[in-house]
Regions:
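N-terminal amphipathic/basic-hydrophobic helices that include classical n-h-c signal peptides
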Residues: 1-21
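Short acidic (Asp/Glu) and glycine-rich catalytic loops that position anionic groups and cofactors
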Residues: 54-59, 290-293, 321-322, 362-368
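Low-complexity, acidic/Ser/Thr- and charged residue-rich accessory regions of DNA metabolism proteins
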Residues: 373-377, 395-445
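Helix-hairpin-helix/helix-loop-helix acidic hairpins
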Residues: 296-325
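Phosphate-backbone recognition surface of nucleic-acid-processing proteins
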Residues: 336, 340-396
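Helix-hairpin-helix
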Residues: 303-309, 325-344
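Intrinsically disordered or highly flexible coil/loop and linker segments, enriched in small
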Residues: 88, 260, 323, 340, ...
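Structure-specific DNA junction-binding interface
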Residues: 14-292, 433-445
C-alpha cells in the first residue's frame, strides 16, 4: 500500500473511463489574467476578419485544417494578435472564440463547422448544443456530449495544476471531427491556462492526450494523463476499491511520519512531476514544442518578437516592387500599411507551424485594444477586411488573381528572410506606428 497511499485523495475524482474515446489534448497556453470587455467596434471587426481567415483555410486546406489550427496554442495566440486583441492576456481566448462563434455559426451549413459552448453559463449549454447538432447531422450526440465532458473533466480534475475551468468551447464539423478550446483561472496567481484538444491527433485518451497548453510557469504540476503516470493511475484505482477505514488509518500513519513531504515527492518516479524550463532567448517560455507561456508584462518588447521576420514583413510591404502585388494595389485606398497587415494575415493563413513561435509579432498587423504595441488602426483594419473579402468572393467565381497575391505576400516575406538580413529596428517601427496612428484611425479602449 505504501506508494499508493500518497495519491489517495485523488482516487474518487480520477475514476474515469479514459480509454473509451480516442482523443488528444494538443497543448496549453499560460496567460496573465486580465479583466475588462472587448468594445463592439473591435468585436465586430474580429468577427469579420476571423471568419474570413477561417473561410480561406477551408478553401485552401479543408475544414479539418481549421480544427487542427485551433488546437495549436501558438497559432491560436497568433490569430488573436492579428485580430487586434490584447496580444498576451487571458481575454484573447474568450474574445477570439466569441468572434468565431458569431461568424462561423451563421454560416455553419456552408462551412460544415459549428462552435458550441463559451464562457460561464454558455459553457454549460454545450451538451444541449451538441445534441441539437447531432440531430441535424446524424452524428452520435451522446458520444459527443461524453467527449465534451471528459475533456473538461481531465483538465479540471486529472491534472492538478490549480486552474479552475470557466470556459469551454467545442468546435464540431459535420463529419464528426472536433476541437476543444477551454480555459481555467487561478485567482491566487492571477493567471489563466488555455487547453487545446483535437480529435485528429491522438492515439490514446489518457496518455499525453493534449496537443498543447498555454500558461505562466507555475513550477511543479501533477499530470496523471502522461504515459509515465500509468502506475499511479493503477494505484489510485486499486485504492478506490480498498476498505475506507483501512485507507484512512494508513493515511494517518503517512501524515504522522511525514512521508508526504517535498523530498519524497521529488524522488517519486510513479507520477510525472516536472518543472517548466525557462527559455534563454525570450521571455516567452516554450516547451514540448507547441506549448507556450506568455510573459507578465503588458507592453510588447523587442525580445518578444523575431525581428528578422518582422523586418521581412515590413520589407514586403514597403520595399517590394509594386508589380508583385499589382492586383492588390489597384484596390482604392490600399497602400503599404495595409499590405503590412495583409502580409501577417497571409502568414496566419498560409504559414507552417514553425512560423508562430513569436505571437507578439502578429500584433503588428492591427495593434491592440489596450494600445500595445500601438492603437488599433481602424482604417487599415477595414481595408484589410475588404481586400480579403473581395479576394475570396472573386476566387469563388474563378478569378484567383487577388487570392494569389495575398498568398504571395507570405511567400515574398519568406524569400526576403532567406536571401536578405531584414532585421527590424523595433523602436523605430513602434515610433512610426504611433506617429501615424491618428491618420490610420488609431483607437483604444
Amino acid at each position: 500500500m505504501g506508494s499508493k497511499n500518497r495519491y489517495f485523495p485523488l482516487a474518487i475524482n480520477l475514476f474515469l473511463h479514459y480509454t473509451c474515446i480516442v482523443i488528444k489534448r494538443t497543448g496549453y497556453a499560460d496567460l496573465p489574467l486580465h479583466v475588462g470587455t472587448v468594445p463592439k467596434w473591435l468585436a465586430d471587426r474580429m468577427m469579420e476578419l476571423g471568419t474570413l481567415i477561417v473561410e480561406s483555410l477551408i478553401i485552401n486546406y479543408g475544414k479539418k485544417e481549421v480544427l487542427q489550427r485551433l488546437s495549436d496554442p501558438l497559432w491560436f495566440q497568433s490569430l488573436g494578435a492579428v485580430l487586434g486583441m490584447d496580444w498576451h492576456s487571458s481575454g484573447i481566448t474568450t474574445s477570439v472564440m466569441y468572434a468565431l462563434k458569431r461568424g462561423i455559426n451563421r454560416r455553419a451549413k456552408e462551412f460544415g463547422l459549428c462552435v458550441c459552448g463559451g464562457r460561464g453559463k454558455y459553457s454549460r449549454k454545450t451538451p444541449e448544443e451538441l445534441l441539437f447538432l447531432a440531430d441535424a447531422t446524424g452524428l452520435d450526440g451522446e458520444n459527443l456530449v461524453r467527449t465534451s465532458k471528459l475533456t473538461a473533466k481531465v483538465d479540471s480534475t486529472a491534472i492538478q495544476d490549480g486552474f479552475q475551468l470557466y470556459q469551454h468551447n467545442f468546435i464540431l464539423s459535420d463529419e464528426g471531427d472536433w476541437a476543444v478550446v477551454q480555459q481555467g483561472m487561478n485567482g491566487q496567481t492571477q493567471t489563466a491556462r488555455r487547453y487545446h484538444w483535437c480529435s485528429e491527433s491522438v492515439k490514446n485518451f489518457c496518455e499525453d492526450p493534449h496537443t498543447a497548453v498555454i500558461g505562466e510557469n507555475r513550477g511543479k504540476i501533477l499530470n496523471l494523463t502522461a504515459k509515465e503516470a500509468s502506475p499511479t493511475k493503477n494505484a489510485i484505482i486499486q485504492i478506490s476499491k480498498e476498505n475506507p477505514d483501512k485507507i484512512i488509518k494508513e493515511c494517518k500513519q503517512i501524515i504522522d511520519t511525514n512521508s508526504f513531504s517535498k523530498s519524497s515527492l521529488k524522488n517519486a518516479t510513479e507520477l510525472e512531476l516536472f518543472e517548466n524550463p525557462e527559455s534563454e532567448k525570450t521571455k516567452i517560455l516554450l516547451y514540448n514544442d507547441r506549448n507556450l507561456t506568455m510573459p507578465s508584462h503588458h507592453e510588447v518588447r523587442a525580445e518578444d518578437v523575431d525581428l528578422k521576420r518582422l523586418g521581412a514583413v515590413l520589407a514586403t510591404a514597403y520595399s517590394t516592387p509594386t508589380d508583385n502585388f499589382e492586383d492588390l494595389l489597384l484596390t482604392q485606398g490600399l497602400g503599404p500599411r495595409t499590405l503590412q497587415t495583409l502580409t501577417l494575415v497571409s502568414e496566419v493563413i498560409y504559414g507552417t507551424p514553425s512560423r508562430f513561435y513569436d505571437p507578439a509579432r502578429f500584433s503588428f498587423a492591427n495593434g491592440g485594444k489596450d494600445g500595445h504595441p500601438f492603437p488599433v488602426p481602424l482604417k487599415v483594419y477595414d481595408n484589410a477586411i475588404q481586400v480579403l473579402q473581395d479576394s475570396i468572393e472573386k476566387s469563388k467565381l474563378g478569378y484567383k488573381d487577388k487570392s494569389e497575391c495575398i498568398k504571395r505576400l507570405h511567400t515574398t516575406a519568406l524569400e526576403i528572410e532567406k536571401n536578405c538580413s531584414p532585421e527590424a529596428d523595433f523602436e523605430k517601427t513602434l515610433a512610426f506606428e504611433r506617429a501615424n496612428s491618428d491618420a490610420w484611425g488609431g483607437k483604444t479602449v
